[in-house]
Amino acid sequence: MKAPVNETLVMDIAGHVAVVVTDVAAVAEVLVRLDFAWHSDRWKRTIVDDDDRLSLVGTLVELDALFSAGRDWSPQALVEYYREIGVVRRGYRSIAWRGPEQYVIEQH
């Protein structure tokens, strides 16, 4: 999948490890401060508990990250659930792939 340039993509956040891809240097600096570590082509960080996950989601929303849409508990589905229960109160963006090099970005 071809990722958009100058963006931050949340690839996983519902599991035990948060996975983020970015080519934005300022965002990478924030990820380091949040204890993310660089692994090959992406940033990863263990999620301690649900409060930790919610804090990460909040920070990534503030960074205007794109939350990947997909099946099951995709990052976008998790953020939407948090909005439904009132713990995320601001808008966010999602990305869905329609093909290997075709994606759609939506504002929610």
Regions from the PLM with identified roles:
Residues M1-H108:
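Accessory DNA-engaging acidic/polar modules
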